[in-house]
Amino acid sequence: MKRLSLTLLLLATVIAFASCEKEDDIVDIPSLNGMALNCVKPAYLKAGDRVALISPSYYTPMENIVKTAEVLRGWGLEPVIGPNADKVYAGRYAGTIEERVSDIRWALNDTTIKAIICNRGGYGTIQLIDQIPLTEWGAHPKWLVGFSDISTLHGLLTRAGVMSVHGTMSSFLAAGGVDATSTLMRDLLLGRVPRYEVSAHPQNIEGQASGILVGGNICTFAPNLGTQADATLGHDLILFIEEVGESMHNVDRQFNILAMNGVLDRCKGVILGEFDGCGSEFSYESIEAMLRQYIEKYNIPLLCGFPAGHGDVNLPLVMGAPVTIDVRGDGATLQFDIDGQRQVVNTADITAPVSSPVSTRMRLAGKSE
């Protein structure tokens, strides 16, 4: 009996030790250290650099990818189209999971490729979260550009310790050509870092804060909690969220999921982007007013109305970068604390050449057909 008890005790000790080792492995991931993370900033692009065009989510017609390639050539860059970029699977996906993973791995591991631009969002990146280890995401730091469903990939890169760009995708470049938004994205990739001057908003909460920028499309970002794409586990975060075409109650639900998982406790500030086409089934003045009621409990600054997301203007943001926001009564500033040539951008001066319906922007992003 004593021998059995001793055996059980030893077994319990081994299990406990193994559990501690596993927990330590999780804690040791560098991107859980918040401001101490210091995500690597990929090298800025230069003339002749190769840029991969891949489709991690919904399919994109080859004609749109080719148009984007022409835009990139006009920027002095060399576009390289992923082998499976225009595949179609199950009516919507850009190929099977295996094909999409293959293109991502090709783009990540080819050291001659210096940046990756995603062709379209939609849905599908959540299927890829556990397909590629974080070490592979961070092995050869390079810029990845996209938004909407691509928010998942931004989370993976932040966890891997690499900055990325929340910005315009191929489907929008092909449809709109070169405008102020895409020009700013080009400038950022080439080393001209924006310092945004943002107009005042009635729902702003004044204050100054610095932290690591995380987030993206809220209905993509929130379900990633607890996965290796969850970039909210550090401290001193600046949370950015945007959405399009969702009901108010779904935005409320996703935000409360973030709050109840402690994300807001780890935030130093919040940035609300575009919420175009989101429902108005409640009598709140706006989605910003609805979300402010939760945010104000944390005594952190809130910057509303930043033109990024699914609107006509989608200004580039550096995810995983240290950022400072200063929200005042007369407006706000957003500054990335990374090296590069500075340029001041007054967001009120940035307009789209042609205003497109919400339905069109949703289709281009892959949020609808």
Language-model features, listed with the residues they occupy:
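N-terminal small/polar loop signature for handling phosphorylated ligands or for N-terminal nucleophile
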Residues: 84-140
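Bacterial N-terminal signal peptides
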Residues: 8-16
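Short, acidic/small-residue loops that bind anionic groups at enzyme active sites
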Residues: 134-156, 163-169, 301
